[in-house]
Amino acid sequence: MDAQHSSNQALRTVQVAAAAIVSEGRFLAARRPLGKRFALMWEFPGGKLEPGESFEQACVREIEEELDCAIVPERVIESVEHDYDTFHLSMKLLLCTLMEGERPCLIQGEHTGLIWADAKDAMSLDWVPADREHIPAVLKELGLSAS
């Protein structure tokens, strides 16, 4: 096998901004749609950075597109590097709040469900692998334990 086809070949990196939208001691989890990778698994809403975008800008744009609401990103609470079979994910999770009067909406094709999750929900939901890695940090931010 030559180097070009080596199993150790570098994976392309995909940069993603995800939102831990918090309200009243809970955080928003979104269920992925049918027909997409990890269908019906839960995730933190967000998406890929566009050229020239910061993680904060991408987070605001993606939440507007996916949930039709406006958020205020406060800060990055965790970064995760995760290898999938066809790409390397570099994800930053931003602690966010909803702007006053805003509420997330289901938009056809984006998600099949939304839940304001507490610690019990967080541990029982079927999470996308990279997003699962963020759960302890989010619970810590909310002052909750993973028990």
What name fits each language-model region?
Residues 9, 103-105, 111, 130:
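A beta-strand edge to alpha-helix "cap/lid" segment located at domain peripheries
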Residues 70, 80-104, 115, 119, ...:
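Active-site-adjacent beta-strand/loop module that shapes the phosphate/pyrophosphate-binding cleft
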Residues 44-76, 118:
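The catalytic Nudix box helix
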Residues 119-128, 132:
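C-terminal structural segments of small proteins and small subunits
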Residues 2-28, 48, 79:
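Conserved N-terminal beta-strand and adjoining loop/helix that marks the start
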Residues 36-41:
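A conserved beta-turn-beta hairpin within the catalytic core of GNAT-like acetyltransferases
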Residues 130-147:
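Charged phosphate-binding loop/patch that engages nucleotide di/tri-phosphates or the phosphate backbone
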